[in-house]
Amino acid sequence: MSSTKTIGIIGGGQLGQMMAISAIYMGHKVITLDPAADCPSSRVSEVIVAPYDDVDALHQLADRCDVLTYEFENVDADGLDAVIKDGQLPQGTDLLRISQNRIFEKDFLSNKAKVTVAPYKVVTSSLDLEDIDLSKKYVLKTATGGYDGHGQKVITSADDLEEANALANSAECVLEEFVNFDLEISVIVSGNGKDVTVFPVQENIHRNNILSKTIVPARISDSLAEKAKAMAVKIAEQLNLSGTLCVEMFATADDIIVNEIAPRPHNSGHYSIEDCDFSQFDTHILGVLGAPLPAIHLHAPAVMLNVLGQHVEAAERYVTENPSAHLHMYGKLEAKHNRKMGHVTLFSDEPDSVVEFGKGIDF
């Protein structure tokens, strides 16, 4: 890159913080917009303290920055459209709108990107649930909002319909047939508007709908891994992607099914900071700046463990007992239960021997 840029990041959580660190290493200046003055990004960047939907604050950020990006998908797309200049938000707001609404997302994945998704139907009220086949298992998800399992109801029998009907009557939903999968996996892919680069396939283990452990490379066949990466690239190319995208998938014995996309760096890609020659945050910054993207090389098999609020002391003990482990703490002031406080990355080719911090204790 020929010159220093000022990059505006909407969102000052851990993802914004790690984006900022990558940008600063490359010589750029970072300004963050976040409602909290003591957000994680405040440790590494200037912060404009304001709500995300504050149009005046968005104007200020846009006026002071060459390029804008966001660390999460629940950003006011209309507000951004009102303040950005042409080309100032390389990720665009179309990607935001797709990822903010599961109905739009399913339509994009199945009909435009033409990748395999679980059978689904749009649900506008409980009337749409009256004729479902209860010999099958389903997941009902609100079309908008919801994360880490919020806004979802699993339907396995008629006993679940009362709660499902209430959810369906409260908001538009998507009803997905439950996938009998072997593994949950994800693929990180980054683009610069022209080209893409793809990371290794990651295997993800969730507890209470929160990511607990990521294993890289995923323990699937080479042919399935290549299929997963090809599907992620296909999605990225259909989006004309700038920046980093995570594609979450299910791996069955002989197929890959796409679950959802996140239009930003992702928790499951944090291992890349130590384990790849360029991290998902590096390629995100390169991508939104339109810079050339490198091929990604994995240094060694690795495991990433999430550190939740109830795990902080255990994680600190762990790294004193395993000094080759890499501990990242995000600088959040209050260690709330199930709040993501940090992560640990450890090189290991025996992933089952790396025990999650809360396993058998507090999941």
What is the role of each PLM region?
Residues 24, 84, 110, 134, ...:
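Anion (oxyanion) recognition and catalysis
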Residues 3, 286-363:
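Peripheral (often C-terminal) accessory segments that flank ATP-dependent C-N-forming ligase machineries
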